[in-house]
Amino acid sequence: MRPTMVAGNWKMNGLSGDAVHLTQAILHAGLEPMRPEVVIFPPFTLLHAVSQEAKSSALRWGGQNLFWEASGAYTGEISGAMLRDMGCRYVLIGHSERRQIFAESDAQIVQKIKAALLSGLIPVVCVGETEAERAQGLTDAVLRRQLEAVLPLLNLEASQPNLIIAYEPVWAIGTGLSASPEQAQAVHVFIRELAAAYSAQLARRLLLLYGGSVKGNNAAALFDQADIDGALVGGASLQAGEFIQICRAAESAGRGG
């Protein structure tokens, strides 16, 4: 049985006081450790504050991005080793905002995934289609293109996948819209089938998160779907009560283990 995960992407939000408040709220919520695994992705400037609060707990944290070089004259960038030095276990790669605003290509995303793996980080790789692509019936084609760049990086000699996939329909991010549980499930099945072409065993164990306006009032229905293993939460992760409600929905789904 695959574990569950709820990941909160704080994006470019919060100061140190906010980080302490949110982290403490999660820690004091009485969630059962690792069911689900709870991960937060704060801005780089808040990683230290989060790590100091969470270092003796089951709560995990990660970076929102990284550069593919280990060090050098890359002003404004951050390396995998730097994230590891801050206690990060995970890193987001290929978020739709990075793809759209910063024009990150599939090739660049592959470079970042490789750098993350070399640094001992677990990449949470984001894929998804825009509203225009969806309207043209291109969802499967877009996902196939994005994933055919990523899935060859699966370590076929490992017993567990070395990365996580987050499906984020771009049309649902920050809009209040969300794919129905059945729509999201269908896409997750498609992703798992693509992964099975590389390894049926790893595909069965591959953690697939849904990210698209996940909230406390729709999380349970999403987590009831067989191939939705958790959520990548955006705006709702900045509201302690809402985020904890999502975590409790994952906890109640009974799929941890």
Swiss-Prot record:
InterPro entries for this protein: Aldolase_TIM, TIM_sf, TrioseP_Isoase_bac/euk, Triosephosphate_isomerase, Triosephosphate_isomerase_AS
EC number(s) on file: 5.3.1.1
Alphabetized Gene3D superfamilies for the sequence: Aldolase class I
Single Gene Ontology MF annotation: triose-phosphate isomerase activity
Catalytic residues (positions): H95 (electrophile), E168 (proton acceptor)
Group of enzyme by EC: isomerase
Tagged with keyword Isomerase: yes
Database matches in Pfam families: TIM
GO terms for cellular component: cytosol
Coiled-coil blocks: none
Keywords, sorted A to Z: Cytoplasm, Gluconeogenesis, Glycolysis, Isomerase
Residues involved in substrate binding: N9, W10, K11, G174, S213, G234, G235
Ribosomal protein found in the keyword field: no
GO biological process, one term: glycerol catabolic process
Cellular location(s): Cytoplasm
Pathway assigned to this chain's UniProt record: Carbohydrate biosynthesis; gluconeogenesis; Carbohydrate degradation; glycolysis; D-glyceraldehyde 3-phosphate from glycerone phosphate: step 1/1
Function description: Involved in the gluconeogenesis. Catalyzes stereospecifically the conversion of dihydroxyacetone phosphate (DHAP) to D-glyceraldehyde-3-phosphate (G3P).
Matches recorded under PANTHER family: TRIOSEPHOSPHATE ISOMERASE
Quaternary organization: Homodimer.
Protein family membership: Belongs to the triosephosphate isomerase family.
The protein's name: Triosephosphate isomerase
Species for this entry: Acidithiobacillus ferrooxidans (strain ATCC 23270 / DSM 14882 / CIP 104768 / NCIMB 8455) (Ferrobacillus ferrooxidans (strain ATCC 23270))
Gene name for this UniProt entry: tpiA
